[in-house]
């Protein structure tokens, strides 16, 4: 069970730790400290869920914690939702193996946050209530836009959940000795408990606690590494170059992507996909007003940026302290557990078994924080967008909507467990890439254009959104990851790893073309309503949810 925690840290919601599933290694010895910390963490978070359940009485409480989260708290929770085990272990592993390239990768994740800060956060909060579909459908036709938005959200949520569950099961099995199926079921049960009873309030505090633990653990590791080199970066880099097999090449870029098109596609997916992730967007509705939403992004960007700096130091520290140490290698000379275990081995090197146990607990917290946010986002898409607004046309009562949401949480739990078991032996890196690509190709264009382009109509949004979604899925299937590696064909039809460059362009062109050619009465009315939406987005007048709700 202790090893269960350690695995969590490697759980990989982002593309970075794709190859963890394919890597094999020896299981770690039993760590009693990790077992104790695991039990303490689960007990504490279940108590938080019980406390949150007493305060969660309405639909607003369940979806958005009543809008009572402060900007600082929300910024910390967003960071907890975004700083995945992949970010910690995956990027650290990239730095460990490739050096400078790992930093380039982390910048791709980080750069999306200023986009959210300057383009989206304020207007999103002023226009929406529970989901981003509230914003996209503000002046457009409710039913078709909400269906598209919900399906796009569910695609992203499902792919992320698969990544989380498979990653959790594999790593728990590797590190803790737990049976894979047992590990997946355990994560699924805890995920359902947090969201089912505690809603957004419990999810928020689990994410905040996880962020604090992860930042504290990473800070300690980075400080210990810098202490060894007398807090001199030149010494760190020189000694890392001296022991790394690639030598000075680790200080140069160029090893992560095979061609400029793939690099650009990946960059676009990481940059703009962040602004279309439903579980991230949903967090902006937990604060009282646009001012707090801006603060949320400001604090989140600071925490996340600081964290990525730490991962860079941790990666080079692993080169220095882990790679030359035979105790972290198996009989073949490979790193035990694969390169994604570099940061975990570094925890043992700088802090012994006690700190290794702490990092194991943080790993488990990382899994639960991310899957809880994903589950709530998926449940709200079904209950609020599909049931309450698309099916019931906005006439569903609050009690029925909450019932549907909680039923959806349980169903998502079963689906997550089932998919985790089904995809046990599958390389799931492409799922994470597809999740970002779908978010960038379907959700992001609809959100951006609906808020900023007065000529957007329902017809344009639907055509552009569906084209972006379908193109992203089709190109990923025809690409080398699925078409060649999984389906066994000799050559891919689409030669690049990621589709975002093309699917995003198609989505924007489709939205533009079918909007400017829309001369219907409905289209003209939607253009006229943009001014009302613009005033609301800038001032928050008529805002429907917050502390006073």
Curated annotation (Swiss-Prot):
Bilayer-spanning residue ranges: 32-54, 75-97, 102-124, 145-167, 182-204, 211-233, 263-285, 298-320, 361-383, 404-423, 428-450, 462-484, 494-516
Membrane topology annotation: Multi-pass membrane protein
Keyword line: Cell inner membrane, Cell membrane, Ion transport, Membrane, Sodium, Sodium transport, Symport, Transmembrane, Transmembrane helix, Transport
Annotated Gene3D superfamilies: Sodium/glucose cotransporter
Pfam families assigned to the protein according to its UniProt record, in alphabetical order: SSF
Gene Ontology terms: cellular component: plasma membrane
Chief site of localization: membrane
Keyword Membrane attributed: yes
Record has Transport as a keyword: yes
PROSITE patterns: NA_SOLUT_SYMP_1, NA_SOLUT_SYMP_2, NA_SOLUT_SYMP_3
Location of this chain's protein in the cell: Cell inner membrane
Domain of life: Bacteria
Molecular function terms, GO-annotated: acetate transmembrane transporter activity; glycolate transmembrane transporter activity; symporter activity
GO terms of biological process kind: plasma membrane acetate transport; sodium ion transport
Function noted in UniProt: Transports acetate.
HAMAP family noted in UniProt: Acet_symport_ActP
Record-stated family: Belongs to the sodium:solute symporter (SSF) (TC 2.A.21) family.
Name the record gives this protein: Cation/acetate symporter ActP
Taxonomic lineage of the native organism: Bacteria, Pseudomonadati, Pseudomonadota, Gammaproteobacteria, Enterobacterales
